[in-house]
């Protein structure tokens, strides 16, 4: 049993360090409420490149914003991740947060989900496999080596970013690793279709689901960006729609639309075990004698054993050196 939190708060748009500092403040806040896990939206650092929907790619406004966005993408590890890591250490929090990542020696950006442990260590990094629609002008494609869960003292946590959650095989890879809490950071505004997908994942995986949507209002933009006149005065550009669901696919917190808020829920992991008594998609209901799954040439058994097949891929998985992560 433990409290989990979905943090629906706007980023400090196009200012990566300010975003990290806001995240640190929210981490402290949810810790005071007894939470052990905090989940932030997709691309919380440095915000969503929403200008793609409001201006032509060959316009001067677009070019200026695109350059600024790329400059505010973060390296991992870096000053922004250390800011978040320090907050995790100070408050013994586990955190999942969306960022735009820029590798140190490459020109490609990635839509990345980072996991931090209560000791400040970066426990995992998942790069979005398939950017959606015009997102392909912004982010590159991740590979399967980052489809991994993380072990925490409270639960096995995994996640997918936005429309990745519609990919059944990607979900199955996480299920085979014993996922108990599924985080789904998104830019989706909590539509009925999105909430239906979250219910499906909770029902299919028999686990807790934390969906955290991006909240962005015209009033949240920096003055110089608002002054470009691309966005209607006072408009809600993304309404958030965050929600927390239990393993019976019931919404127990939210959905929260158009407001800055933090959702909390008591997440009892015993509920996941009980729910799987009737249906276990990769266990007794998986029919591993009929179905199989491979990921980058590694066979993923549909029956969870004592060891994860993902360990066969460990040589290909990025890890933060302990000396760096500990600062």
Enumerate the predicted regions with their spans.
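Structural detector of well-ordered beta-strand residues that form the stable sheet scaffold
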Residues: 96, 158, 208-210
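Cys-nucleophile CN-hydrolase/nitrilase-fold catalytic domain and related Cys-dependent amidase chemistry
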Residues: 16, 28-118, 188-205
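C-terminal beta-strand edge segments of enzyme domains
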Residues: 214-327
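N-terminal phosphate-binding loop and adjacent alpha-helix
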Residues: 8-25
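Active-site catalytic loop in hydrolytic enzyme cores
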Residues: 76, 81-86, 93, 101-181, ...
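Extreme N-terminal starter segment of soluble prokaryotic enzymes
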Residues: 1-6
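Short beta->alpha transition motifs characteristic of CBS
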Residues: 46, 50-53, 114, 126-132, ...
């Amino acid at each position: 049993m433990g409290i989990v939190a979905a943090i629906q708060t706007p980023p400090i748009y196009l200012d990566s360090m300010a975003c990290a500092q806001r995240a640190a403040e929210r981490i402290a806040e949810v810790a005071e409420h007894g939470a052990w896990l905090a989940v932030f939206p997709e691309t919380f650092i440095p915000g969503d490149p929403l200008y793609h929907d409001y201006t032509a790619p060959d316009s001067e406004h677009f070019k200026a914003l695109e350059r600024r966005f790329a400059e505010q993408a973060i390296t991992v590890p870096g000053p922004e991740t250390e800011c978040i890591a320090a907050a995790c250490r100070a408050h013994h929090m586990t955190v999942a947060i969306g960022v735009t990542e820029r590798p140190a020696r490459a020109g490609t950006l990635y839509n990345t989900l980072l996991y931090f442990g209560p000791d400040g260590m970066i426990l995992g990094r998942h790069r979005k496999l398939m950017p959606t629609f015009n997102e392909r002008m912004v982010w590159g494609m991740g590979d399967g080596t980052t489809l991994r869960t993380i072990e925490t003292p409270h639960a096995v946590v995994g996640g997918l970013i936005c429309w990745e959650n519609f990919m059944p095989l990607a979900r199955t890879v996480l299920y085979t690793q014993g996922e108990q809490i599924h985080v789904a950071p998104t830019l989706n505004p909590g539509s009925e279709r999105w909430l239906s997908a979250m219910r499906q994942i909770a029902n299919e995986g028999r686990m807790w689901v934390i969906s955290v949507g991006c909240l962005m209002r015209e009033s949240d933009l920096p003055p110089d960006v608002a002054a470009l006149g691309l966005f209607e005065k006072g408009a809600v550009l993304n309404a958030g729609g965050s929600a927390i669901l239990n393993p019976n696919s019931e919404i127990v917190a939210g959905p929260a639309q158009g407001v800055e808020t933090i959702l909390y829920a008591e997440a009892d992991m015993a509920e996941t075990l009980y729910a799987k008594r009737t249906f276990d998609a990769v266990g007794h209901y998986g029919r591993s004698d009929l179905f199989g799954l491979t990921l980058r040439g590694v066979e993923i058994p549909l029956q969870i054993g004592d060891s994860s097949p993902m360990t066969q891929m460990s040589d290909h998985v990025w890890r933060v050196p302990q000396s760096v992560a500990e600062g």
